[in-house]
C-alpha cells in the first residue's frame, strides 16, 4: 500500500496540524480541497483559509469549489484517482458519489469521542455541558452526519478552567496523531472498524451568537461552563445599562443576591449574583471598549453594587 495518493479536505486552523503531519510523513498529498476565500474581520478583507495557505506553501494544488457536491467537481476529483481522502473540518457535506471514489474510502478526523457530540461544534458543546473528558475519533465516512464506523480514538481530560480555544489547539494536534495511527493501521492491514451505537449519541449543532446570552438564574458552574464553551466565539455576554458586556473568563463564588445583580466591583473582579451562588467576572469587554482584566476595567469604569446585568431592554 506504499505511495497512496491522498486528497486532503479541510479549511480552518484546526485542520492544519493533520495536513502538516501528512507532509512530514512523506505522504503523497496530490491535492487539497478547501472552502473559497471569504471576507473576515471588521474590515471584511478577503482572506484564504488557513489550509490553503499551508498547501500553497508546500506547492500542493488547491481546489476551492463553492459546492463540492456538484457533478463537475465530483468528476474532477475522480480524475485525480485518489486512493484515500482525508477530511478534517472541511465544512461541507460530501455526497455518496464522492465518498465512493477513493479505493480506501474517506477518513474523517472528528473532535469528539463518538458517538457523543456528532455535528458542527463538538468542542463548544462538551465544555458547555460540563464534561471532564473528550478527545478525537477517526472514522470511515458515510452519508450520515458523523455516523460512520469508528477507527481510532484518542481521549484527553478537560481542565476545569479550559476554554474552547485552548481545547481546540490541543485537539488539533491529537487529531493529527490519531490520523497518523489510523494510516499506519490501514497500511498494515490491521484497521478495525467499530459501529457507532446511536443510542449513546448527542448532537453539537452550529452555535449562534444569541446562544451566548447568560441566564443569571442558572447556577454558577453552569454559567462558567457557558463562558468557557463560548470563548473565543461566539462569546458569552450580558447587558449593562443597555450596552453589551462580553465576558471571557469567570470564577465561581458563594455570594448572595438577586440573580443578575452586582454584589461587588473591585480589583478582584466584578461579582454578580446567580442562582445558588455568584460569578466573579475576571475578563470582559464593554461595547465600544477594549478587552480588559476586570480590575483594570473597573479602575476607569464605575459599576455600583446593585447594578443589574441581564437582557437588553
From Swiss-Prot:
Enzyme class: transferase
General function of this protein: Attaches a formyl group to the free amino group of methionyl-tRNA(fMet). The formyl group appears to play a dual role in the initiator identity of N-formylmethionyl-tRNA by promoting its recognition by IF2 and preventing the misappropriation of this tRNA by the elongation apparatus.
Alphabetical list of SUPFAM superfamilies matching this protein: FMT C-terminal domain-like, Formyltransferase
CDD domains to which the protein is assigned, alphabetical: FMT_core_Met-tRNA-FMT_N (cd08646), Met_tRNA_FMT_C (cd08704)
Source organism per UniProt: Geotalea uraniireducens (strain Rf4) (Geobacter uraniireducens)
A Pfam short name: Formyl_trans_N
Family statement drawn from the similarity comment of this UniProt entry: Belongs to the Fmt family.
Molecular functions (GO terms): methionyl-tRNA formyltransferase activity
UniProt keyword annotations, A-Z: Protein biosynthesis, Transferase
Amino acids binding (6S)-5,6,7,8-tetrahydrofolate: 112-115
Protein name listed in UniProt: Methionyl-tRNA formyltransferase
Lineage of the organism: Bacteria, Pseudomonadati, Thermodesulfobacteriota, Desulfuromonadia, Geobacterales
